[in-house]
Design a protein with these regions (language model features):
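Extended alpha-helical scaffold and adjacent linker segments that couple domains
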Residues: 1-281
Length: 281
């Protein structure tokens, strides 16, 4: 325990030397104080409440300061974020976090994870029933221009902000003209894409560094990272489901006017009805 206390003190001392934002250091100290209180969830809102020291505080300005402080602390690996939970990092945890962030991953791994989340976890089917004739129709699954499995006549492509032409909405729309596919464009979400990358980096780092030669402290951190990644994946699925339900749909050269849905699969099924009607009039 004394060793851990010393390590934490070193983290605080280092932060005081390296950070110019004095409020960020205060937030870091508060996160240290609640690090081992399992019943206190360190969400942005709870941290914001914890840091109020004046009943007349301007809440909007205060929350902006909290936002800025947490961004600084996360970017410099003094804290880690998993979903909406922020956690103080000890020296060893900080070292591992920085090594994870510096782990190289390729674009194919990102596209593969997006496919697993959107098609395998949310849509879950490789056929969708057309309600007019009760017939099931196969479709090709595509993410950001990459297709998976054998190509079928009908095509469902999901576009994320990882796509090279994401900003060119007119181009995406024009690609559907005269085609037998539809495109669902997710709203830009930097947090989602950052968490996708962190999930892949964490899994790769943990796999590369597990083994009998690992120091006990690092082995413990790796085990915690692995458990946190399970939670991260669940959060990614929730975020993706919401984004898919709110996505823009393009088919046959036009934008399909549809109501948003709380459920991504429902949105896809409803849009698919329109696609089948256009392709097989």
């Amino acid at each position: 325990r004394n060793e851990l206390r010393g390590e934490i003190q070193q983290s605080i001392i280092l932060a005081e030397k390296q950070l110019d934002d004095r409020f960020a250091i205060k937030v870091l100290k508060a996160l240290f104080l609640v690090k081992y209180f399992g019943n206190f969830k360190t969400t942005k809102r709870n941290i914001s409440v914890l840091m109020i020291d004046d009943i007349n505080v301007d809440l909007k300005a205060h929350e902006t300061k909290i936002d800025t402080a947490l961004t600084i602390l996360e970017n410099q690996s003094y804290v880690q974020r998993n979903g909406d939970i922020f956690e103080f990092l000890t020296d060893d945890e900080k070292d591992v976090e920085e090594e994870i962030k510096n782990t190289d991953i390729d674009e194919q791994a990102i596209t593969q994870l997006l496919k697993e989340i959107l098609f395998d976890e949310i849509i879950r089917d490789n056929k969708i029933k057309y309600l007019e004739n009760k017939q099931d129709y196969d479709f090709t699954s595509k993410i950001d221009g990459s297709f998976f499995g054998r190509e079928k006549e009908l095509e469902i492509e999901i576009i994320t902000d990882n796509y090279q032409d994401y900003e060119n909405e007119a181009f995406i729309q024009s690609q559907t003209m005269g085609s037998t596919g539809m495109k669902l464009v997710l709203a830009s979400n930097a947090t989602f894409m950052r968490d996708v990358r962190m999930y892949i980096k964490t899994a790769k780092y943990e796999m590369q560094n597990r083994g009998s030669g690992t120091r006990p402290q690092v082995a413990r951190i790796l085990q915690e990272k692995s458990m946190q990644n399970v939670t991260r994946k669940k959060n990614l699925i929730l975020m993706a489901n919401k984004a898919l339900g709110e996505s823009k749909v393009y088919l046959n050269g036009g934008k399909l006017e549809m109501t948003t849905s709380n459920d991504g699969k429902t949105k896809v099924i409803n849009a698919f009805q329109k696609l089948v009607a256009v392709v097989y009039p």
